[in-house]
């Protein structure tokens, strides 16, 4: 088995035209590098090996994909299979099938897993908030459902998952709390309650808050000001996640996120970038963020690169990530990890958001799962910094 893996490893390496070093190796002295994985990468591989016909969302060689994922990323995050509508579709009914496959696959490849996510207003089934008659439940009932949900899931994965996004997207872009069902029934207390329940269920794991548009000062300051007194009182939270769904030309992300990292650090918490991608396509309506309810109508002018990303645009894409990773390195004391959202362009959610049916190029691997030049350029940048640091250390010893 080991010999076969090594052969496949070098075969994949050759086809992707990369050196032996990977992204996770290149940046190991600065922060951790991960990627989100959907259940089809795992489910399809299992079915391919068992000779089962697969006709899922992705028609690629899933086994080869995951070898590259295992090579380059030390951490994986599930895209959807741990969200409430999938894992807890009915009261008292849990389905861990896909999530277990994903976790088992990651652990078998020496990777660690971050759970995503426990409490989120979206992709949460309606039953969570109503009784048998369809009436809104009381605060006490919702608390119990939250606690049962969190305890059951964390108990199931105890010892296999190192950290969880406990609460996801609870704030509006202006820094105010979102008026979700959780908020309507429990008020702002649902957030510290979720962290309390998670810590009680498994005190050994890291716990995170996660949100989009965290480059906006109003939002990051609203989030930080909310957590400041809670952290001072000992709330069990280890980091704040900033999703990082970015649009090329839509602002100075390096400057904005530098401010956000420092703002989060002011309350003693680390930052992590949890859902990184970059669209090179036109912005339909000055849109920013990741609110999945926001959609625009398809227009051909909004989908200009159906036959491939022009060389100039690819070079801009590459330089963006070089600048962004340099920013992460410059702030490495306060950055826990950087996680890319989706492995390749074919699987990226950005093809259908905020406009359905576009051809987007938001990830570091193309539609054939071949690494873009960006990957090697990032590795080269890290190697160059390492050589520079070694040279400076030698010079200081003289």
Identify the residue ranges that each predicted region occupies:
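N-terminal pre-domain/capping segments
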Residues: 21-90, 96-100
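Noncatalytic carbohydrate-binding groove/subsite architecture in carbohydrate-active enzymes
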Residues: 25-30, 38-63, 181-298
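Substrate-binding cleft and catalytic face of glycoside hydrolase catalytic domains
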Residues: 40, 71-89, 98-215, 282-284
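A general structural detector for well-ordered alpha-helical segments in enzyme core domains, enriched
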Residues: 64-65, 69-72, 95-105, 149, ...
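Short, electropositive alpha-helical surface patch
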Residues: 128-147, 178, 217-233, 351-363
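Aromatic-rich peripheral "rim/lid" segments of glycoside hydrolase catalytic domains that contact
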Residues: 156, 165, 169-188, 194-197, ...
């Amino acid at each position: 088995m080991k010999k076969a893996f090594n052969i496949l490893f070098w075969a994949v390496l050759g086809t992707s035209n990369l050196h032996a070093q990977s992204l996770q190796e290149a940046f190991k002295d600065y922060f951790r590098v991960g990627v989100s994985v959907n259940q089809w990468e795992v489910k399809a591989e299992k079915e391919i090996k068992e000779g089962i016909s697969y006709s899922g969302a992705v028609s690629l060689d899933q086994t080869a994909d995951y070898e590259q994922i295992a090579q380059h990323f030390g951490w994986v995050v599930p895209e959807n299979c741990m969200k409430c509508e999938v894992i807890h579709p009915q009261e008292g009914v849990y389905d861990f099938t896909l999530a277990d496959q994903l976790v088992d696959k990651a652990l078998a490849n020496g990777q660690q897993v971050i759970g995503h996510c426990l409490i989120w207003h979206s992709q949460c089934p309606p039953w969570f908030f109503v009784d048998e008659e369809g009436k809104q439940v009381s605060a006490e009932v919702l608390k119990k459902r939250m606690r049962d949900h969190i305890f059951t899931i964390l108990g199931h994965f105890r010892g296999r998952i190192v950290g969880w996004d406990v609460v996801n997207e609870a704030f509006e872009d202006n820094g105010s709390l979102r008026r979700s069902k959780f908020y309507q029934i429990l008020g702002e207390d649902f957030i510290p309650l979720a962290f309390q329940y998670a810590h009680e269920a498994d005190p050994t794991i890291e716990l995170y808050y996660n949100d989009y548009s965290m480059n906006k000062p109003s939002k990051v300051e609203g989030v930080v000001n909310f957590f400041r007194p809670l952290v001072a009182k000992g709330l069990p939270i280890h980091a704040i996640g900033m999703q990082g769904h970015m649009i090329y030309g839509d602002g100075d992300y390096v400057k904005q996120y530098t401010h956000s990292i420092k703002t989060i650090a002011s309350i003693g918490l680390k930052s992590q970038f949890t859902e990184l991608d970059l669209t090179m396509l036109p912005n339909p309506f000055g849109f920013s963020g990741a609110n999945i309810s926001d959609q625009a109508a398809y227009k051909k002018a909004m989908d200009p690169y159906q036959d491939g990303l022009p060389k100039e645009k690819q070079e801009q894409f590459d330089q963006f990530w070089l600048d962004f990773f340099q920013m992460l390195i410059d702030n490495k004391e306060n950055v826990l990890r950087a996680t890319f959202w989706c492995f390749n362009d074919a699987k990226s959610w950005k093809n259908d958001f905020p406009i359905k049916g576009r051809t987007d190029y938001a990830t570091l691997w193309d539609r054939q799962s071949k690494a873009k030049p960006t990957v090697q350029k990032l590795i080269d940048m890290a190697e160059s910094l390492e050589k520079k640091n070694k040279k400076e250390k030698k010079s200081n010893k003289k």
